[in-house]
Amino acid sequence: SRILSICNKNKIPVVPFGTGTSLEGNVVGNEKGITISLEKMNKILSVNAEDFDCRVQACVTKEQLNEHLREDGVFFPIDPGANAAIGGMASTSASGTMAVKYGTMKTVITGLTVVLPNGDIINTGGRTKKTSAGYNLTNLFIGSEGTLGVITEVQLRLSPIPESIMSAVCHFPTLEDAVKTAQETIQYGIPIARIEMLNKDQMDISINYSKLKDVNVEPTLFFEFHGSEISNKESIKVVEELSNNNKGSKFKWAADLEERNKLWQARWDVYYSVKALVNNGRVYSTDVCVPISRITECVKFAEVEVNKIGLRAPMVGHLGDGNFHVLFPYDPNDKEIYKKIREFSNKLIDKTLELKGTITGEHGVGLHKKSYLLKEHPDNIPLMKTIKRSIDPNNIMNPGKIFDLN
């Protein structure tokens, strides 16, 4: 509070920093100023297992929290690929592989403590499942990427650990067959917890990087079912039938906890497996999300356009909620390659907006997607700027992110 008050009076830019796992330059300091590290704000303040909620400081990580919760029979279900800090996940409105069942950070956050640019401290929301008490200030700060204040505490809704968890892998002859199966699974109303897609190229990379065994280099879906043993078996029967109708292979089951963890670790390691393809390289990741009825069309479009430019670009997707990523490993010194990547990205964004989708499902806007936000919400940005100027008139909070104020 004192730091922000001093910075505000002296018009010194401030960038809040947690674990630094964001992908869009969200925590890059692009002006002279200071970075506030929240790494020591890593305490779990309270757990109320009987009410399925907890309160944590901003730099508690998802893994730290779930380790702490294990004996209480509850868990925190939002699981991005990186071991991100909860405050950062709130700031980008993150999600992960289980969003299809448990939602995103917007779903599970019921309250925040935020330090405003002038040093004032506010508490939004509370512990209840619902409230009609005034403006929803909690949701104002979720996804604001540190541009309106510093999130220091987060009130979270938790979920009970399921009685039965079953994971399986299914291979398909084409990517379209895999995506169609995922789309139909959701449209049939199957209560699935995870339905993740890896294309053929990404399976090849993941098998080598994560040492996966007994899986094929083919377009693949990773499934996970949460519920009672009886309900899971009923869901599995329907999904197996849908997969079979789309030329899917026989399900390969990850029977025990160790096998399941290895399978999902390979999915979480996708970004790092692609990064390892280029020495000192980077990974450009798209993050489009479309209505579930348009996911097959959008993935097919991306596949065709990738083949046109002739670059290696593995694909992964949280297909259950219409979100997928095309990953380009590249050398930052190769301007020609980067130009091709951006041209592809521009085409995919245009197609996504044509399909009534969004430019970013979970990574946020940061520095890299500002021009795309102008395409998606040209009418909304003036109001966003009005809100920003009202809360942060000196523009000290993470300036230059999401949009350019001036």
Model-derived features: where do they sit?
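Short, ordered loop/turn segments at secondary-structure junctions
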Residues: 18-21, 41, 81, 197-200, ...
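Alpha-helix capping/hinge segments and adjacent helical runs
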Residues: 353-365, 378, 393-397
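Activity-critical C-terminal alpha-helical subdomain
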Residues: 120, 369-406
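FAD-binding subdomain of flavoenzyme oxidoreductases
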Residues: 43-196
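Conserved, mostly hydrophobic/aromatic
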Residues: 7, 146, 326, 392
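C-terminal substrate-recognition/cap domain of FAD-linked oxidoreductases
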Residues: 160, 169-171, 179-344, 351, ...
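Glycine-rich N-terminal segment of FAD-binding domains in flavoprotein oxidoreductases
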Residues: 1-41, 56, 76, 318, ...
